[in-house]
C-alpha cells in the first residue's frame, strides 16, 4: 500500500513464458529505505559501468499503480542467468545469493568456511541457478580458500578464484 513503501519485483514470466522488457525478465523496484538520497545504489552501478565492471542497470522511477502514486524507486536489473550471459563468457557457473545481512544472527552470509556439509551453507545462501545440479562445491571451495590459505598461497592462487583485474577495478572505483 502507498503508506507502507515496500520494495518489490516484477517478473514478466510469472504467468506467461518468454515475456520480457528490454530483454529483461525481472525488474527490482528498490525503496532505498536506508538511503534518504536515493543515490548510493545508482551511483555505484554507474561508477561500475564506467570502469567496465559488470553491474546491473539502474534507473529512477516515479511509480504509479492503478493511478495511485506509490513513490520514487530505484529500478534495478535482476542479477540472473540473463545477466550472466550478457556479462560473462562462462555463464553456466553457479550464482549464489547471500541470505541474511552480515552479522545478522547465526546464519549470516559471511563467507566463512563451515566445512564440506552443504546444509551449513544452504541456511546462509541460496543457489539462484543450476538448481538441478545442486552443486555447492565452488562456494565451499572459495570459502575454504579465503579462510584457510596461507598468505603466500592466497597471493599465488587468487586469480583461480577471482577475476583480479575486474576485482581491482571495482575496489578502485
Residue ranges and their predicted role:
Residues 1-5:
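ATP-binding glycine-rich phosphate-binding loop
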Residues 7-17, 24-32, 51-56, 68-173:
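Internal "kinase-insert"/substrate-recognition segments embedded within catalytic cores
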Residues 18-19, 37:
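Short active-site-adjacent helix-start/loop capping segments
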Residues 21-22, 40:
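Short, conserved acidic/polar surface loops in the N-terminal third of protein domains
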Residues 33-53:
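A conserved alpha-helical element in kinase catalytic cores
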Amino acid at each position: 500500500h502507498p503508506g507502507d513503501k515496500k520494495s518489490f519485483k516484477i517478473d514478466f514470466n510469472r504467468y506467461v513464458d518468454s515475456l520480457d522488457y528490454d530483454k529483461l525478465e525481472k525488474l527490482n523496484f528498490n525503496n532505498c529505505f536506508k538511503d534518504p538520497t536515493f543515490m548510493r545504489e545508482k551511483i555505484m552501478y554507474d561508477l561500475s559501468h564506467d570502469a567496465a565492471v559488470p553491474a546491473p542497470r539502474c534507473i529512477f522511477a516515479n511509480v504509479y499503480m492503478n493511478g495511485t502514486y506509490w513513490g520514487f524507486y530505484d529500478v534495478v536489473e535482476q542479477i540472473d542467468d540473463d545477466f550472466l550471459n550478457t556479462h560473462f563468457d562462462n555463464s553456466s557457473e553457479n550464482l549464489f545469493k547471500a541470505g541474511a545481512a552480515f552479522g545478522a544472527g547465526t546464519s549470516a552470509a559471511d563467507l566463512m568456511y563451515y566445512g564440506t556439509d552443504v546444509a551449513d551453507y544452504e541456511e546462509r545462501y541460496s543457489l539462484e541457478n543450476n538448481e538441478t545440479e545442486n552443486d555447492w562445491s565452488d562456494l565451499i571451495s572459495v570459502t575454504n580458500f579465503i579462510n584457510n590459505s596461507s598468505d603466500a598461497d592466497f597471493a599465488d592462487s587468487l586469480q583461480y578464484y577471482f577475476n583480479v583485474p575486474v576485482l581491482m577495478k571495482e575496489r578502485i572505483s
